Amino acid sequence: MESAAGILEQFHIDVKTGKQLASELRKRLAGGEYRDIPYGDWLAKKVTADLRDIVHDDHLQLRFNYWLSTTESAAKQSEEEARQAVAAHCFFDKVEHLPPNIGYLKFNVFADRDACAKAAGEAMDALADSDALIIDLRDNRGGRGGMGELLASYLFAGRTHLADSFRRADNVTTESWTTPDVPGRKFLGKPVYVLISRNTFSAGEGFSFVLQAQKRATLVGETTVGGSGTIEFKPIDAHFTLVVPTGRVTSPANRKDFVGTGVVPDVKVPAAEALDVALRLAAQSRHGNRSGAGAKP
């Protein structure tokens, strides 16, 4: 646990929070709270609960692996996760046309970009002729940020600077940009609505936040939880890994982030009503487009 405390101090995106977490962890360790926990998975669950109780961040997690963790096993695990994603059609749960000609895309996980670029292209191409697009992230709990970049690339005509991620440990800022050339057709010059809720988390928040800041989408629903930005998996030993927030994501459009405050929707309604409200807005925008108006990327 001392190693975990050191990692939190060194790598947590917020210096004060990292020190607070490390101090509390050491205090509980010295007090013997973890001494009599017999199993690794029990210890991982206890420490995770303690960390989240201190700062209320669902990203924080101590993970336990029964099998020895090696670079080779980690690579095999990533390959297996990618295989499972492809088998599940990359978690694109619904790709539909709703009346009157409104595209509807629902997915609860941002899958691996390399493994799922083809599926993403097929989904976006299938919806390209819609008059408006609704992206449903009300139950999205995050995943791989690269998929968010890819999907956003379908909504902008040119190369667009989406976000900046600052990593405190080495004082490095990484830029995130759209990809000009993507498989399938883009969705340009037409309105986009993103549905969010209290359950929307992590990469789901980042994707919504970026599109809102770029004025490319109207957000409908509830304010999100406000999870931290980017995370890293820090090995403690052969069995334990600490998941720690190491980066803060900001928009180049307004230099803001959503940590702690959450992503605030443009149209605040209960999550259960968000789809119906977005459909009404989309129908209205459809009428406006035929009159010569409409959202532009």
Can you name each region flagged by the protein language model?
Residues 4, 51, 105, 135, ...:
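Terminal peptide-recognition signature
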Residues 85, 89-117, 253-254:
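STAS-typified acidic loop motif
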Residues 66-70, 109-113, 139-145, 161, ...:
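Solvent-exposed loop/turn segments at secondary-structure junctions
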Residues 105-109, 129-142, 195:
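Short acidic catalytic loops
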Residues 113-131:
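A short, well-ordered alpha-helical element
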